[in-house]
Amino acid sequence: MPIQKPCAFINARSGSTSDITEPLTAKLKAKFESIGPVKYVEPAKMSEMISATIEDGCDLVIIYGGDGSALSAAKLATEKNVPIVALPGGTMNLLPKTLYDTVEWEEALDTALACETPRWMAAGDVNGNTFLCGCIIGTPTRLNEVREQIRDKHFKEATEDLIFNVMNFKSEDVFEYALGSSPDTYHEANLLNVICPQMSDFDTGPGGLEVNALDVDSIFDVAGLGLSAIASDWRENDHAETNISNELHVKGSGKIDILLDGEPTPMTLPLNLILIKKGVLVLAPN
């Protein structure tokens, strides 16, 4: 069934967004008889507003922000079988690049709206938490908070956290992981990079999660860690081991640091990661 009533939200705090409410509204009104809200909003209010517009009958959620913003919108929309359009307004924009092959929001929107029907896209899940691009597991992910503080010009806090992480990083802080639904062999690593099929340039066959396990020797080896790590070719690293699997288990107890689509999301071990073939509805070409 064709889209009848789209709505759009612009994350005011994403890496490269600006207030495009006027041109975005004009483009939507030129194509649809009825549209929902087109709002430039603070992140704290976005989830509530998206839920309200879906309840009000909007059947497409357009999100202009980063990959984390797209993830938040996708989780709310997919629960109601409503597709999303992820416009590139963040730092990395991995999802829009993959779906629409552009970093220009107007081109991405035109490509999306030219599609007649939405389609399912695979996603990953770790302990009930969805990710659309990738999941990075291990203590070195704490440096992502330093990166965000620098981007927000919180230099004092960033310096303090960097010193703390350098002083407390231990390369021997390893955990055990295993592949498959009934694992009998566990391996050791202190950093795992799990990439969704659509983000991987590796041959995943019929579709699977790309799992890169690394033994990071020094915190300086991951000084630039963030969402960009999902796009990096970690397979060239001498300490990396790459596998494809629909399921991954991580042993242990206590807290562990995780990045989901670039967003810090600490969790409690053990972890169970699975591929969800129908993970999120998107309005995008096949």
Region locations from a protein language model:
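ATP/NTP phosphate-donor binding region
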Residues: 1-61, 71, 75-79, 107-109, ...
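Catalytic core of DAGKc-family lipid kinases
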Residues: 7-9, 13, 40, 79-85, ...
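Short beta-strand/turn micro-motifs composed of small residues
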Residues: 10-12, 65, 215
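Short, solvent-exposed amphipathic alpha-helical segments in soluble enzyme
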Residues: 23-26, 78-79, 148-149, 227-231, ...
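Domain-scale detector for complete catalytic domains at protein termini or as standalone homologs
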Residues: 56-58, 166, 279, 283
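Structural motif
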Residues: 63-65, 87
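Conserved Motif II region of HX4D acyltransferases
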Residues: 69, 123, 262
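ATP/nucleoside-binding phosphotransfer catalytic cores, i.e., glycine-rich phosphate-binding loops
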Residues: 206, 213-286
